[in-house]
Each structure stands twice: as C-alpha cells, then as structure tokens.
Amino acid sequence: MRILGIDPGSRKCGYAIVSHTSNKLSLITAGFINITTTRLQEQILDLIEALDCLLDRYEVHEVAIEDIFFGYNPKSVIKLAQFRGALSLKILERIGNFSEYTPLQVKKALTGNGKAAKEQVAFMVKRLLNITSEIKPLDISDAIAVAITHAQRLKPH
C-alpha cells in the first residue's frame, strides 16, 4: 500500500510517499512543492497540479494530511486553510477519502512525546526508515512523519 503524507504550508508543501507492506515501511519519494507565484489563485492551481502529478505517477492508495497549526498569524491561517481546502477537494475527487493528524498526534506517534521538536521527529523518521542522508527542509521530514503515523494506524492491533 502506498501512503501519501502531506505537510501543507503557505510557501512549501512537504510531501512523502511511503510504502507499507507486511508491517515494513519504506520511503518511495519525498520532497516539497515550492509555491512561488504571488496570486492566491495561481498558488492553489500550482499546488493542485503538483498533487495531481504525484497521484498519477505513484498510484497512491491512502492520503494523510497534517492539520493546520494555529500558532500562526490570522492571515497565514486563512491562506493555509484555503490551500488545505483545495488539497482536500482534489484528494476526495481522486482517492475518495483522507485522514487527518494533528502535529501533536504525529510527534507522539514517532517520538512518544507530543511536544517533541521538529528535529527529534526528523531523527526518528531517519531511524525508522533507515535513511542516512539529511532530510531538508523539515517540511519533508514532517510529511514523511505524517505518512508513517498513518501507516501505524493501519497496522492490526
């Protein structure tokens, strides 16, 4: 099963596709969608086109999105909500459903501590997937962490 993890952002949207088979996780690809245009409508279209390409290329079965963190200023929260709404609609059209995880849930799933620093999450991502190289920017490791969190929820108890 292929899981797409998404860490939405107003400038960079982190993504990761993780394979989950027989209780084994492996990273297929990860990166970020760089949002460079200035008009909101163009930004949303660029984001959706990039998502479409990922869904086409990697035959994703499940999608998990990190919830918006509300510590930002109100303008940023509104913009992120618009991006997230557009992403959600496209995912519903293409996949049919998606799961959402708060930053606290993701941090707790990977480190055991809901207040862990991003660097601790990145360390655990590398450890769980046997990645030796650095994962930069942290938007990418966050997206991988979202996909891993979802995979852990899919495991039989």
Curated annotation (Swiss-Prot):
Does the record's keyword annotation contain Protein biosynthesis?
A: no
Name where it mostly resides: cytoplasm
Gene Ontology MF annotations? crossover junction DNA endonuclease activity; DNA binding; magnesium ion binding
CDD domains of this UniProt entry? RuvC
* PROSITE patterns in alphabetical order: RUVC (PS01321)
**Catalytic residues as annotated in Swiss-Prot or TrEMBL:** 7, 66, 139
Quote the record's cofactor note.
Answer: Binds 2 Mg(2+) ion per subunit.
InterPro entries, per this entry? RNaseH-like_sf, RNaseH_sf, X-over_junc_endoDNase_Mg_BS, X-over_junc_endoDNase_RuvC
GO biological process entries = DNA recombination; DNA repair
Give cofactor(s), names only. Mg(2+)
Q: Where in the cell is it found?
A: Cytoplasm
Positions of Mg(2+) 1 binding: 7, 139
**Per the record, what is one GO cellular component?**
cytoplasm
| HAMAP family noted in UniProt | RuvC
Its quaternary organisation is:
Homodimer which binds Holliday junction (HJ) DNA. The HJ becomes 2-fold symmetrical on binding to RuvC with unstacked arms; it has a different conformation from HJ DNA in complex with RuvA. In the full resolvosome a probable DNA-RuvA(4)-RuvB(12)-RuvC(2) complex forms which resolves the HJ.
UniProt name for this protein: Crossover junction endodeoxyribonuclease RuvC
Q: Which organism is it from?
A: Helicobacter pylori (strain Shi470)
Q: Which gene encodes it?
A: ruvC
